[in-house]
């Protein structure tokens, strides 16, 4: 909004001219979302605590240390969604189609997560909305997003770019839509599975969002994209502002989510954040890079899939003491803080590997 209001005055005002730069607006988005989180966090947490008598239900079969979390309110993802959306509406170009499509997906996945959290809190169990129902809703929203991208792009690309290789891409044709839906839904649920310990998912999400802030900027810049031999996609640079807002809102949320957590982001936060990262990767044509940068989410998801498959195949045997993987290490006696920090380190490594693909070809 501010960008659109100040745009006519960029040649007459130094301040207005600053808003012409995506990097300036991205930095400002981080400051705004951090500030909003610090200001609204205590108010929202107290409000959620007053509404949720018992807080988020804690699994009885989980690590014993988790019983100390009883009574902690959930739905803290509302803080992340509100601050990110507000900063984006203030600082991004509101004539940009990618901004509106991404915000639509972000909020829609947040609503699904809210429904799930609400069901858990009201029923006082950790099951929530049926898994198939959530997948169906996620699939419908992802399909709508893919159709919008197809319709609004004059010449939509169905190419899947392979990182670390020059000029290597796969033309998926209209199967790309199915693939894109898989990426968005998969990303949403992968982040959801990772969000099992205080602060565990928040920092890797910030790393991933920060990585895609850079990717969006480069892909949307003709000079940089040509230099790095990336697929140039006009107008994607504005997503840098949104990604920067995600970084700031996640760091602001971490202030309250660090162990011992005062609030959980819940499915409201994890499903929406995973979904929006998937959407941005599809728009920027860096779907495989998302799997690399967000490698921690992939590993956590793979551990659940392997556990379930092996359990069914062997009629009761398990590969891990408990899935997702972070619970396995807790069952091995690792302190929660040690698991979280070590997983953060792994996330940094994956982010660096993913970003190196922009240059190493």
Curated annotation (Swiss-Prot):
Name of the top EC class for this enzyme: transferase
Reactions performed catalytically: UDP-N-acetyl-alpha-D-muramoyl-L-alanyl-gamma-D-glutamyl-meso-2,6-diaminopimeloyl-D-alanyl-D-alanine + di-trans,octa-cis-undecaprenyl phosphate = di-trans,octa-cis-undecaprenyl diphospho-N-acetyl-alpha-D-muramoyl-L-alanyl-D-glutamyl-meso-2,6-diaminopimeloyl-D-alanyl-D-alanine + UMP
One Gene Ontology MF term: metal ion binding
Pathway membership, UniProt: Cell wall biogenesis; peptidoglycan biosynthesis
Membrane topology: Multi-pass membrane protein
PROSITE patterns named among the record's database cross-references: MRAY_1 (PS01347), MRAY_2 (PS01348)
Pfam families hit by this protein: Glycos_transf_4
Membrane spanning stretches: 28-48, 74-94, 99-119, 133-153, 168-188, 203-223, 236-256, 263-283, 288-308, 338-358
Cofactor(s) the protein needs: Mg(2+)
One of the GO biological process terms: cell wall organization
GO cellular component: plasma membrane
Signal peptide per UniProt: none
Subcellular location: Cell inner membrane
Role summary: Catalyzes the initial step of the lipid cycle reactions in the biosynthesis of the cell wall peptidoglycan: transfers peptidoglycan precursor phospho-MurNAc-pentapeptide from UDP-MurNAc-pentapeptide onto the lipid carrier undecaprenyl phosphate, yielding undecaprenyl-pyrophosphoryl-MurNAc-pentapeptide, known as lipid I.
Similarity remark: Belongs to the glycosyltransferase 4 family. MraY subfamily.
HAMAP family: MraY
Protein name, entry field: Phospho-N-acetylmuramoyl-pentapeptide-transferase
The organism of origin for this protein: Rickettsia africae (strain ESF-5)
Gene from which the chain derives: mraY
